[in-house]
Amino acid sequence: MGIRIYKPTSAGRRNMSVSTFEEITKKRPEPGLIEPLRKKAGRNNQGRITVRHRGGGHKRFYRIIDFKRDKFGIPAKVQAIEYDPNRSARIALLAYVDGEKRYIIAPLGLKVGDTVMSGPNAEIRVGNALPLGAIPLGTQIHNIELEIGRGGVLVRAAGTAAQLMAKEGDYATIRMPSGEVRMIHLRCMATIGQVGNVDHQNIRLGKAGRSRWLGRRPRVRGAAMNPRDHPHGGGEGRAPRGMSTPKTKWGKPARGVKTRHNPRFDRFIIRRRK
């Protein structure tokens, strides 16, 4: 993947950069692997905003991705590398020898014409999926399951990769991209390699309108609001926030306060993320 930088023909173009999309080989998605995606605009089933700053954006179809990789022992050929508007990574269209087609997250280095396979007896090769127990130590992996048979939920964003550090008993020790070290069961599946589209983090949107195309609405500072709307609001001119620690819109401590609460998996974390 390359990045194109425009000449500064306007204020928006001056700081804009876009992907060259040179790895994309197919423009239209596979008809049997898409479904309509209704816009939620950050609302729940009661119509109330649960995620702020969402709304608008270009219409999308959802691409059905195979995160489970549960078609064991059947080889598949990579037919195309495609763009997916619903994620930062590219996706690869696989055609299995039995005629079925599926999408997977495209790892770095996977090309059209390559053959991939999943299962405990698959080779240690980019794009192949195996249980953690069958993967050698030190291997870079992505699309990792947390629960056996649930499908990959970890390390799916563009350019990310985890590393298999150790195996002890029924569990493998994995170092995550965030620096967190955690234990995952050896029967959980993972895919070999690093997620592709590694230059995604270097793309600059350049203008507010491009954020709106992605469905991201403006984020207003608390200090620019009224006191009734935010703890930082009010005052004459640019007033200090008037409290020792910054607060959220709802008066809870912000910045650096842990919000994670998942007791089921907390006990498997060996070292917290950096």
Curated annotation (Swiss-Prot):
Q: Which InterPro entries match?
A: NA-bd_OB-fold, Rib_uL2_dom2, Ribosomal_uL2, Ribosomal_uL2_bac/org-type, Ribosomal_uL2_C, Ribosomal_uL2_CS, Ribosomal_uL2_dom3, Ribosomal_uL2_RNA-bd_dom
Gene Ontology terms: cellular component:
large ribosomal subunit
Signal sequence range: none
Question: Where does this protein have compositionally biased stretches of type Basic residues?
Answer: 249-259
SMART domains listed in its UniProt record: Ribosomal_L2 (SM01383), Ribosomal_L2_C (SM01382)
An MF annotation (GO) of this entry: rRNA binding
Task: Give GO terms for biological process.
Answer: cytoplasmic translation
Family listed? Belongs to the universal ribosomal protein uL2 family.
* Functional note: One of the primary rRNA binding proteins. Required for association of the 30S and 50S subunits to form the 70S ribosome, for tRNA binding and peptide bond formation. It has been suggested to have peptidyltransferase activity; this is somewhat controversial. Makes several contacts with the 16S rRNA in the 70S ribosome.
On subunit structure and binding partners, the annotation says: Part of the 50S ribosomal subunit. Forms a bridge to the 30S subunit in the 70S ribosome.
The name this protein carries in UniProt is: Large ribosomal subunit protein uL2
